[in-house]
Amino acid sequence: MRPEEQLNALRALYSWANEINVDGMAVEVGTFSGENAVVMAKYFNRVVTIDPWLNGYDKDDHASSADMAEVEKKYLERTEPFTNISHIKLPSIEASKQFDDGSIDLVYLDGDHRTEAMVADIDAWKPKVRPGGILAGHDINIESVHNALKQRFMGVVAQIFTDSSWGIII
């Protein structure tokens, strides 16, 4: 479970998005058990979550070794009441190909945190965000995520939220 402080920071991120008219479709890459998706569903008309629920992608990430059948079950239980949440059970890059460029209001990256994977996610998902939309994510305090952001957005001002979430207006 995410601590209440993290959930409050996510609410702040999505409120900020709504204030600048970003409230249509949101995509969450790396939904895990759906806690963030449920928060998103209250701020966006449509939420699409992406997660293949596969093990072993990163030996340094505890989520990579979780019981993914249980995680998926918890996700389904948690999101079932929300008619505006749907799921694509594919790896991030493959799932990104199902969206037209400029078609998404907000993308939240919280999947594979290795630098090369984050760079690939940024490269795949940034074109999908509409002009004026937001590319955001979690764990800017993790060195690999921070390095990926520096590689792709050096010199760009990002909004940082208290739980280490970040957001950039595209």
PLM regions: where:
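S-adenosylmethionine/decaboxylated-SAM
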Residues: 3-4, 11-170
